Amino acid sequence: MRSKFKDEHPFEKRKAEAERIRQKYPDRIPVICEKADRTDIPTIDKKKYLVPSDLTVGQFVYVIRKRIKLAPEKAIFIFVDEVLPPTAALMSAIYEEHKDEDNFLYVSYSGENTFGQEGWVELPVDDMDKAFICVSAAKKHWVWVLCDVRSSYQNCVLIVPLVQRPVLHTHSSFLSVSFALLFV
């Protein structure tokens, strides 16, 4: 997505502003947040944010939701370089990995997974108990588990909607599928 902020402000001015901000507030991240094209989600009232470096992506999404007065039942997705970042990631880590050459972090948001691909991805699951945990956590998002019962559940495959890059987490030996911001 092309940034309107970049179109409206020359590179030298953006870079100088970001450097000034980083010098004055070294524990803050300069973020430009813009609505993605072709989405019916409300437009945010301001684009520039100084985000604490220890804020998580999920907490930042909460700030955006409040700024645009989005109803709790409505989905919101944020993208950095057209990728859904993990909600538990610190904004400082996202900044270090994805900051622009002008030293701003560009974030876009949408009511749909506009950069996701259509289709499905299969993920092998080695334990049926783990597979049921996945299904119970994400059943309203069309997650299915296919198992070959003739092989005593040894060949289970978790099938999930392809959301850019599905993220797998293992916590206490439980497998869970992160659907980025669907649960925020």
From Swiss-Prot:
It comes from the Eukaryota. GO terms for cellular component: autophagosome membrane; cytoplasmic vesicle. One of its GO terms (biological process) is autophagy. Signal peptide: none annotated. It holds the Pfam family ATG8. Residues 117-184 form a propeptide. Keywords: Autophagy, Cytoplasmic vesicle, Lipoprotein, Membrane, Protein transport, Transport, Ubl conjugation pathway, Vacuole. Disulfide bonds: none annotated. The record marks 116-117 as: Cleavage. A lipid is attached at residue 116 (Phosphatidylethanolamine amidated glycine). Its main location: membrane. It is found in: Cytoplasmic vesicle, Autophagosome membrane; Vacuole membrane. The C-terminal 68 residues are removed to expose Gly-116 at the C-terminus. The C-terminal Gly is then amidated with phosphatidylethanolamine by an activating system similar to that for ubiquitin. It is a lipid-anchor. Belongs to the ATG8 family. Ubiquitin-like modifier involved in autophagosome formation. With ATG4, mediates the delivery of the autophagosomes to the vacuole via the microtubule cytoskeleton. Required for selective autophagic degradation of the nucleus (nucleophagy) as well as for mitophagy which contributes to regulate mitochondrial quantity and quality by eliminating the mitochondria to a basal level to fulfill cellular energy requirements and preventing excess ROS production. Participates also in membrane fusion events that take place in the early secretory pathway. This is Autophagy-related protein 8. It comes from Laccaria bicolor (Bicoloured deceiver). The gene is ATG8.
